[in-house]
Structure formats: C-alpha cells, structure tokens
Swiss-Prot record:
This is ATP-dependent Clp protease proteolytic subunit. PANTHER family: ATP-DEPENDENT CLP PROTEASE PROTEOLYTIC SUBUNIT, ATP-DEPENDENT CLP PROTEASE PROTEOLYTIC SUBUNIT, MITOCHONDRIAL. GO terms for biological process: protein quality control for misfolded or incompletely synthesized proteins. InterPro entries: ClpP, ClpP/crotonase-like_dom_sf, ClpP/TepA, ClpP_His_AS, ClpP_Ser_AS. Its main location: cytoplasm. It is an enzyme of class 3 (hydrolase). Belongs to the peptidase S14 family. SUPFAM superfamilies: ClpP/crotonase. Cleaves peptides in various proteins in a process that requires ATP hydrolysis. Has a chymotrypsin-like activity. Plays a major role in the degradation of misfolded proteins. Its EC number is 3.4.21.92.
C-alpha cells in the first residue's frame, strides 16, 4: 500500500493487530492506524515511514526491487527536492546493473541521500552504503560490511564467453574506480581489498572509508550534515 496523503496525526498500532502481506515474500507487515478528524486511515509500516522520507533496501538487489527503490527516490524528490532522504540497508547484494541503477538515481535526484547499514551490507549492498552523501554514511555497531569483485557465469560459444569475460572485467574496473571515489583509497588498495571477500566490522568500515560514522544511538543534536534539508542523523 503506497497511500501517502493521509491527514497529519499521531500514528498508533493500537490493539487492532492488523497486518498486510508482502506480495513477494508472503511475510506479514504491520499496519499503522491513524486517527484524524476525517476518520481512520491505515498504512503498511513501510508506506508510513516513506512519508517520513525513509526508504528500506532489504534482501537481494535485483531489477524489481531496484525499480521500487528508484520510484520511491523519484517520488520523494517530487515531494520536496531540498529535504534529505534516509536509506536503510540490510542486503546481501545482488545484480550489479540493478545496484548501479539505484546508484545513478541517488546521484541524479536533488535531495541528499543518507545511507545507514543495519545488519549487513555485502557486495552491491556495501556499494550503495558507500554511495551515500559524504558525511552522512552511517553503520550501526553490529553491522557487517563485505566488499568483493563482481562475479558471473558464462555459457555458450568460446567467442560469447570471451565477450562476457571482457564485460565482467570492464564492470570490475568501473566498480573499483567508484570505490576509490567513495573511500579516498588508492586504486591498488581497492583492488587488493576487492580481490576476495573482505569482511569488515562497523569501525573497520569507517576506517576504510566506506562509512563516515558508527552510531550506537541516535544523536541528540545535528552531527552528521549541515546545510538546507539537513536533519542530522537519519530520521
């Protein structure tokens, strides 16, 4: 449910015990019920948080999921092009092209996108985490971050396999160059770290340059970003 135009009021779960079902996974999703002078309105929890400019990147990064994330980014830009967006990431990674589509949209829109790692950010998940607005990339203390080079399988004639191998190498170079941009590390350092699976704890990821802050609790004051639209730590 993506109903974002309800009346402003305090949301409550109450005693209704209402849930909706995720159409993809079948998982139960809590429903928030709002009371207003115009009556009662219900939102699934993710739609309610989207009204607060919070987006979730969870599970495998693939084309359908990427399309949903991109649509939310574009919608929030249309709502307010100068107000920050918070992106919470808990993902094992996935398809490179799907992740790059999300990344390009993050760069394309006008609002700044703060990224927050909860749980894990591996492979393309770590890429999106590092791609957040500089100074606004956050990991919670028990988050795990993993980086590695892209992988893929090739089948068919030898010439087709050769073409696909060249494409993977080209993607690897592009990814390495972007990680250099995100982290400030040298290309040699990035290539070495990306050669195999490299797992990092939150503090290690901060030292490496993948995130800027490790927060155990939400700061009471604005300590993350400055300027118009800044809300400090993510909402």
């Amino acid at each position: 449910m993506l109903d974002l135009f309800g009346a402003s009021s305090a949301p409550t779960f109450g005693n209704q015990g209402k849930f909706t079902t995720d159409p993809v996974t079948g998982a139960l999703i809590p429903v928030v019920v709002e009371q207003s002078s115009r009556g009662e309105r219900s939102f699934d929890i993710y739609s309610r948080l989207l009204r607060e400019r919070i987006i979730f990147v969870t599970g495998e990064v693939e084309d359908h999921m990427a399309s949903v994330i991109i649509a939310q980014l574009l919608f929030l830009e249309s709502e307010n092009p100068s107000k920050d967006i918070s992106m919470y990431i808990n993902s094992p990674g996935g398809v490179v092209t799907a992740g790059l589509a999300i990344y390009d949209t993050m760069q394309y829109i006008r609002p700044r996108v703060s990224t927050v790692c909860i749980g894990q950010a591996a492979s393309m998940g770590s890429f999106l985490l590092a791609a957040g607005e500089p100074g606004m990339r956050i990991a919670l203390p028990n988050a795990r971050i993993m980086i590695h080079q892209p992988s893929g399988g090739a089948r068919g004639m030898a010439s087709d396999i050769e073409i696909q191998a060249r494409e993977i190498l080209r993607i690897r170079k592009r990814m390495n160059d972007l990680y250099v941009k995100f982290t400030g590390r040298s290309l040699d350092e990035i290539e070495k770290a990306m050669d195999r699976d490299t797992f990092l704890e939150a503090e290690e990821a901060m030292k490496f340059g993948l995130v800027d802050k490790v927060f155990e609790s939400r700061p009471a004051t604005d300590s993350v970003g400055e300027g118009e639209g800044s809300g400090g730590a993510p909402a």
